Amino acid sequence: MCNINLPVIQKNIAKEQKILDNARKKMYYKADFPKDFYWPIDGRISSPFGAERIINGVKQSSHSGVDIAAPMGADVKATADGLVILAQNDLFYTGGTILIAHGGGVVSGYSHLSEVMVKNGDNVLAGDIIGKVGATGRATGPHLHFTLSWKNIRVAPEFICKTCCPNRDE
């Protein structure tokens, strides 16, 4: 029999949500706001932005990002230049999670990572490898949950991102 302590789990989830909310509130100012945003990985979108989510027969909030199917361990790249404002290895819902502030209130998020390769305070460039695709947190298989937000308002990445990230080695 599985022994689940629901109050403890709920307390941990609330604590993690506060960590995420506080990270998203951090202001980051850049004189040279990125003009281009790229997809962080090549892959098929397995769940689009805004999709209705039903879990155990109960309607949930709309999907706040896009899920991109990709092989376990595939490189995840920064969508644009920015500052890492959160790098966590194991959050309950989102597993390995990175948030990057790009200036002007724009933040990108990368979740379910098997490996987080940056730390809080790191400056990254578009195309830098920041993590590896995984199935951590509440995930049913390997994929990247990718989000973009502007001042805490979720934005559909399809309207902002160009093709996949440039190769930083070239």
Predicted features along the sequence, with ranges:
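Catalytic cores of peptidoglycan-degrading enzymes
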Residues: F37-E170
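Non-catalytic extracellular/periplasmic "stalk"
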Residues: M1-R44, P48-F49
